[in-house]
Amino acid sequence: KLAKAFPDLIIILNHFSGPLGIGPYENKQAEIFPQWQKDLKELSQHENVYAKLGGLAMPVNGFGFHMQAKPPTSDEFVSKQKAYYETALEYFTSKRCMFESNFPVDKASISYPVLWNAFKKIAKDFSSAEKDQLFYQTAAKVYRITD
């Protein structure tokens, strides 16, 4: 309702809108994911809403990386979370998405270099222009960062 009522207001969706995976939502990712997709698609219809892509490494999302004997590799990270990134990128496109690290909170689950390497792997099939948007231009536009 807010995005529709204020179309000139830039709204930033943080951490994929927080698809929780602990507490009453533990082990329900397969059940929650379709509803999350539906809600995200509806939200993406508002051109003033942008998505920050990151934060899924947080323990509250239920992927369990923080409980593993070793932190995940970038490939392991991508294999468990790619569907979330693909969904957001499909609905919002690179023009309204930006990668973000959510450090230091993500540090409980993954190292900073491994996380950014995972983002590069997620974006590997995108054009150079789309990668520029995901890794810089969208954030610069939304946060009004100038050279």
Regions found by a protein language model. Give the residues of each.
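Catalytic pocket-lining loop regions of alpha/beta-barrel enzymes
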Residues: K1-M98
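Weak global preference for isoleucine
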Residues: I10-I12, I22, I32, N102, ...
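Short, glycine/acidic-enriched loop or turn micro-motifs at the edges of active sites
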Residues: G18, F103-V105
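Mid-to-C-terminal alpha-helical segments outside catalytic/metal-binding sites
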Residues: A83-T87, Y91-M98, V105-D147
